[in-house]
Amino acid sequence: MCFTPNSTTALNTAINGVVRPGDRVVTTVLEHNSVLRPLNRLAAERDVTVEHAGCDANGALDYDELERLVTPGTRAVVVTHASNVTGNAVDIARVAAMAHAVGALVIVDASQSAGTAHIDMQAMGLDVVCFTGTRGSWVRRGPVA
């Protein structure tokens, strides 16, 4: 467990701590900029290959496309649990099973779901879960926290 000031810092720390030069990462088009920006920077500066699984017309993750993209040699799969763009939830246990089948790590952005959705890291097979204490869990921040 690692406490950071916010989800953006947690996601940046996790992504930069796991991904190495030349690695391959799979993510989705449903991600927040706190995932996309560090991945884009790693692609530009560290020769990291970043693949993006799409979604259907209703904004739901295309699991078939994700499974095609998650191949041996994939270092990490970075995925949201609930999209801030579409509001759709992602079956993170299903994603974790795909990732672990090829030896990839799973980094989950649970900023929109932690505190309101059940997340069992062990049962779901999640390696890293990042979230904020100010949403869903009703933790106050600042001098009155």
Where are these regions (language model features)?
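Pyridoxal 5′-phosphate
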Residues: M1-A145
